């Protein structure tokens, strides 16, 4: 019970920071299938800047290990709570997030992998705090069937990468094999299978 109370207080402290518009819980904890090894995946949506200097003292009260402002995938703080549970906090610009959703879902644009990950994250997250209801409004706006044009564009883009164009994965695998570069063969084969 204390773990839930402490973590709730952490969300409250983050929510009190200027510029924080919304906070959401994602991953296995939001989906209801967390186990004893599950971490917390938390998304903090901001308008403006929430600096590392502002975040660090808040997190220090709850965490015994912190890596502040990592940028491996997104802007994030990777921490270990004092109870031993890992915590990943991702900081996202709410306006940029909205633009990205529109670009994918409404405009049907595809990327190389991860095209719909933000949309899925929005639709499966549990909102913990929503200052003006903007995140909930986005959830409602984007709770739509999978757009046919998006499906078409993802398939078309990925089919080209599988073969038939100069930088396609099959050509990259062939070239790596000819060079005896088995690390590249493995890497490109994984990308091929991902597509």
Across the structure, where does each feature detected by a protein language model lie?
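Residue-identity detector for threonine
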Residues: 4, 8, 115-116, 124, ...
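Metal-dependent nucleotidyltransferase catalytic core
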Residues: 1-21, 31-37, 44-112
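Conserved NTP/Mg2+-binding pocket subregion across the NTase superfamily
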Residues: 64-177
